[in-house]
């Protein structure tokens, strides 16, 4: 089985994020092996692959959410602005200020719609006045294409919104603190088709200002929204455990129409497994 990776996408500009010879462990278990990739700025990059291949694990490494797991450790580097985000003197809270996350299930805070957006802005000291806070809240909700639906009920609970609206509220909350990168871990997995379309349209709008990395099991979704796609696979070892690795990373059209690797072709054509 293929264990090397094919990076046919080449970029000359400075990437938004890059992984260099990255391996991830939980205790003695190796979850990901030797990942190297450069994520371009202001593009949508999709991670696809079977369950258990490490897509979400890698995504969470990009803003150090895996630090919350005691047995997690990492070899290699993740570079943001040419600095390894895992250097000992780097504050993970500051990293998360610049690299935001939207999770699979909508998770609004138990607060009003207004305070869902304002919370991170307050914590980071990004608004100097009530007027400035109001502007940030409105701008963020407009960016999430939610303003017209909620502008007359900003004092209501975020839980009063529909599932699709809640997810757009979470996206608005993520962009309110003006991150460079927004990570999305299957953001449409729990949404109905109509809400999914709205979130995909939103992602297409947000790429103008943000770098977006999205994990998705929906390959049609990847073809609709992603500029680039990375295909990950998993290999079983003697213990029966499986480690993930990057098979191929290229422009989305190439991955789906002219992949270099047979494993990629088998997966995107439905012959996988």
From Swiss-Prot:
SUPFAM superfamilies, alphabetized: P-loop containing nucleoside triphosphate hydrolases (SSF52540)
Catalytic activity, as annotated: phosphate(out) + ATP + H2O = ADP + 2 phosphate(in) + H(+)
Primary location group: membrane
GO MF terms, alphabetically ordered: ATP binding; ATP hydrolysis activity; ATPase-coupled phosphate ion transmembrane transporter activity
Domain of life: Bacteria
UniProt-listed GO biological process terms: phosphate ion transmembrane transport
Subunit structure: The complex is composed of two ATP-binding proteins (PstB), two transmembrane proteins (PstC and PstA) and a solute-binding protein (PstS).
Family indicated by similarity: Belongs to the ABC transporter superfamily. Phosphate importer (TC 3.A.1.7) family.
Protein name: Phosphate import ATP-binding protein PstB
Organism: Trichodesmium erythraeum (strain IMS101)
Gene: pstB
